[in-house]
Curated annotation (Swiss-Prot):
The protein's name in its UniProt record: Arginine--tRNA ligase
PANTHER family, per the entry: ARGININE--TRNA LIGASE, CYTOPLASMIC, ARGINYL-TRNA SYNTHETASE
Gene name of the encoded protein: argS
Reactions catalysed according to its record: tRNA(Arg) + L-arginine + ATP = L-arginyl-tRNA(Arg) + AMP + diphosphate
Record organism: Thermosynechococcus vestitus (strain NIES-2133 / IAM M-273 / BP-1)
Keywords carried by this UniProt record: Aminoacyl-tRNA synthetase, ATP-binding, Cytoplasm, Ligase, Nucleotide-binding, Protein biosynthesis
Disulfide bond positions: none
Gene3D superfamilies: Arginyl tRNA synthetase N-terminal domain, HUPs, Isoleucyl-tRNA Synthetase, Domain 1
Entry's EC annotation: 6.1.1.19
Length: 584
């Protein structure tokens, strides 16, 4: 199955070439109609070309329409207003398209014609610190982008660029050496919560005790030089954090390949050497820097990006440049995506600029920063605990599951239903975690959003429970009607007689174009909105059109439409990282 918008776009392009031959045409040629009264798709290409060609848009439209060969897809194309072209898909085309999608796990969506090698850099917590609510968005958004690109046939390397190197390890090792030396030689000697507490105390000592500062810096040097005891201690600390991170990744069903900052240490000197060789690196106040184009300080002078500090140390920019080169040269990536908070936008713009000016980024390679806003509490401020502490991510997820369980148990009591503990555990976890993911992904990532358990767990509105319930309604048909989807005849026609059937069918065939839009804009909320509207359209169809009691062949047709809706919801939710449930 090829998306209708792609077929119509190709036909429109051919018609334009026949009627108005030009080297290029305005893009996009075609978009989904803004309102039902304008059809299913619209084009304003004639309006865009009017000035260039010196003709009225409507006159141009009248020249183009006779060359449009779309009789197999659409009703006669309508010229509307000053020169818009309106396209309405035929029910026969919709039925044939959906029938072709029925037998495919991919719902007829073909993989990309030109698959890319993509690196998605996301999550990236710091060792010896607990993951907090600030890591939620990067982890969920990055995973969703990776899932969609993988589905489209791209090769995706999901990288976790953990903060596993730096001065903080010298502080921590020096402090533990004094107060709890067993932690530096024995696995599992302390948990991550204790490690965080020790880290805070080590930081206080470092800031107030010059002698301790010297000891910490000596530990950093020992670590950098590969001294066995220091390196063993560092490995134990990293492993302890890694185990705790994995508990969260397992809960969220996140797959990642860890490649921390320390991995790139051997490549840092080459960054300095090569930037110097190409004439970009200069010395400024003892530091080695690259002066940036388009970035200025308060005095209006070019702003420097520090590559090597005056004491000879490296920083985040150095590591990110080394990582970028490695991903292009060794991983052979032709698209690198960084998913971080909006506060790092300037940093990545500067790193990308230096890499491009140094000639490290071939023309076929795309560098993309995917920024996102803050998670806010219901008071409109950054989400924190009542005592003002940053919320631990594990606590946030555990609370979501607990609230989901309480809602489920209350509903079971009201309905007089008895379910097994295993059922309650599975449903509570799926809805709780799914609600957290969907609440995040359904927002435009560029915006801040308000975190509310009550809203995200509601069965009403644009929420995960609402979508999961729509899927459950379809599965309920199989139980009440004793129906096996596998026995539905593949040759039975889709009738699409009722208006709600037609609206649902039109929406179902738009999945591919929705995924294309998401992978272009990297905005998962587009997919969420599609699935929400799909659930609404299905519920309208379900409430208006008898299914199990309908006569044949209407019953078979409507069951097929319900089945396709369920499969689309299942696929779409899986791309958001949310599993479906047969019962809730």
């Amino acid at each position: 199955m090829v998306a209708p918008i792609k077929i119509l776009g190709d036909r429109l392009r051919r018609a334009l070439q026949a009627a108005l031959p030009l080297d290029t045409y305005p893009q996009p040629l075609l978009v989904p109609a803004s309102q039902v009264k304008f059809g299913d798709y619209q084009s304003n290409v004639c309006l865009s070309l009017a000035k260039q060609l010196g003709k009225a848009p409507r006159e141009l439209a009248q020249e183009v329409v006779p060359h449009l060969e779309v009789e197999d897809l659409c009703q006669p194309v309508e010229i509307a207003g000053p020169g818009f072209l309106n396209f309405r898909l035929k029910p026969e085309f919709l039925a044939a398209t959906l029938q072709a999608a029925r037998g495919s796990d991919r719902l007829g969506i073909p993989p990309a014609r030109e698959p890319r090698r993509v690196v998605v850099d996301f999550s990236s917590p710091n060792i010896a610190k607990e993951m907090h609510v600030g890591h939620l968005r990067s982890t969920i958004i990055g995973d969703c982008i990776a899932r969609i690109l993988e589905f489209q046939g791209h090769t995706v390397l999901r990288l976790n660029h953990v903060g596993d190197w730096g001065t903080q390890f010298g502080m921590l090792i020096a402090y533990l050496d004094e107060v709890y030396p067993d932690a530096l030689t024995t696995a599992n000697a302390l948990d991550l919560g204790d490690l965080v507490t020790f880290y805070k105390k080590a930081k206080q000592r470092f800031d107030s005790d010059p002698e301790f500062q010297q000891k910490a810096r000596a530990k950093v040097v020992a670590l950098q030089q590969g001294e066995e005891q220091s390196r063993r201690a560092w490995q134990l600390l990293c492993e302890q954090s890694r185990r705790e991170f994995q508990k969260i990744y397992d809960l969220l069903d996140i797959q990642l390949t860890e490649r921390g900052e320390s991995f790139y240490n051997p490549f840092l000197p080459a960054v300095i050497e090569d930037l110097a060789a190409c004439g970009l690196l200069v010395e400024d106040q003892g530091a080695k820097v690259v002066f940036l184009e388009g970035f200025t300080n308060k005095e209006g002078q070019p702003q420097p990006l520090i590559i090597q500090k005056s004491d000879g140390g490296y920083n985040y920019a150095t590591t990110d440049l080394a990582a970028l080169r490695y991903r292009i040269d060794k991983d052979q990536a032709d698209w690198i995506i960084y998913v971080t908070d909006v506060g790092q936008s300037t940093h990545f713009a500067q790193v990308f600029q230096v890499a491009q000016r140094a000639g490290w980024v071939p023309p076929h390679v795309t560098l993309t920063h995917v920024p996102f806003g803050l998670v806010l509490g219901e008071d409109g401020k950054r989400l924190k605990t009542r005592s003002g502490e940053t919320i631990r991510l594990i606590d946030l997820l555990t609370e979501a599951i607990a609230r989901s369980r309480a809602d489920l148990e209350q509903r079971l009591a009201t309905e007089g239903r008895t379910e097994s503990p295993e059922f309650i555990d599975t449903v509570a976890r799926a809805i709780g975690i799914g609600a957290v993911k969907y609440a995040d992904l359904s927002q435009n990532r560029n915006s801040n959003y308000v975190f509310s358990y009550d809203k995200m767990l509601s069965l009403q509105g644009n929420t995960a429970p609402y979508l999961l319930y729509a899927y459950v309604r379809v599965q309920g048909l199989t139980r009440r009607g004793d129906i096996d989807w596998c026995t539905l005849s593949p040759d039975s026609p889709l009738l699409l007689e009722d208006e709600t059937e037609q609206h649902l069918a039109k929406h179902l065939v738009q999945l591919e174009e929705t995924l294309d839009l998401v992978s272009t804009e990297l905005l998962p909320n587009r997919l969420c909105q599609y699935l929400f509207e799909l659930s609404q359209l299905f519920n309208q169809f379900y409430d208006r059109c008898p299914i199990l009691s309908a006569p044949q062949p209407t019953k078979q047709s409507r069951l097929t439409l319900a089945y396709l809706t369920a499969q689309t919801l299942k696929l779409g939710l899986s791309l958001l990282g949310i599993p479906v449930l047969d019962r809730i």
